[in-house]
Amino acid sequence: TSLYDYFGNIVYTFDLKMAIEQGFLTPYYYHPEPVYLTEEEFDEYIDLTNKLTKLHPKEDEPISEVALRIAIKRTRVQNNSIAKLDWLDKHLVESDGIHHTIFYSGDKIFSQVLSLLGVEKHLILHQFTHKENMAKRSRLLEAFARGDLQALVAMKCLDEGVDVPPTETAYFLASSSVSREFVQRRGRILRNWPGKKNANVIDLISIPPERFIHLGKSSEEYRIVRSAIRREYLRVKEFSELAINKY
């Protein structure tokens, strides 16, 4: 391309692994947590996958605008699974030990996540979304850094160039259909901060209902969603490879 012709070949890259090893980013523990889609959610997921396959049969080819909208809609099914609320309710028992924590939520369950964490779990928190202007965001980040806020419940903001270096724990209820965006989200919470030795990433991964596992690889449903499941697996693998607790 003209850019490569002008600047020449890339002779040096500085990736996430190097940034962590050289101390520019904080090391992290990675905890993938599978949660099962409901039957209704899975039916919608299957339907969208069928439509996407017809519109975009070859993954290595450019995706059309219509197919992209369907892919995003399918990702939203995973991001907004009701099972993620159940998981939070079950696993966040004591609120006293929670601090400098971000919950990255899907849009449809966002208000329910706020209610669960703020009302039922009694966390001192605030939403952190596109609705907050830059001045408000700045005040919230300052309160978060001081510890006045235990948590921020975020939606999309980590895709908009917002770094949150005081973050020590991040719950990813929502992933992204774009790999680059998800890598950026991880990088934004790994920024160094005084006293921050490591970070924890808890990744809630939506998978097909439990009965799907018992159907085996020969089932029609497995064939339909195989590529999507593989993408989730590759994301988990990538995140795990750079984690302290690599497995």
Specify the residue positions occupied by each region the protein language model found.
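Conserved nucleotide-binding/hydrolysis micro-motifs of P-loop NTPases
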Residues: 1, 18-21, 34-39, 108-109, ...
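Short, charged, surface-exposed secondary-structure boundary motifs
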Residues: 1-2, 132-140, 179-186
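Post-DEXD/H (motif II) to motif III coupling segment of the RecA-like Helicase ATP-binding lobe
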Residues: 1-30
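Conserved strand-helix element at the start of the C-terminal RecA-like helicase core
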Residues: 31-42, 46-115
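Long, largely alpha-helical accessory region at the distal end of helicase-like NTP-driven motors
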Residues: 75, 213-247
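Conserved helicase ATPase core of P-loop NTP-dependent helicases/translocases
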Residues: 100-104, 109-118, 122-159
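A short beta-strand element within the Helicase C-terminal
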Residues: 151-155, 159-176, 181-184, 198-204
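Conserved segment of the helicase C-terminal RecA-like domain
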Residues: 188-224
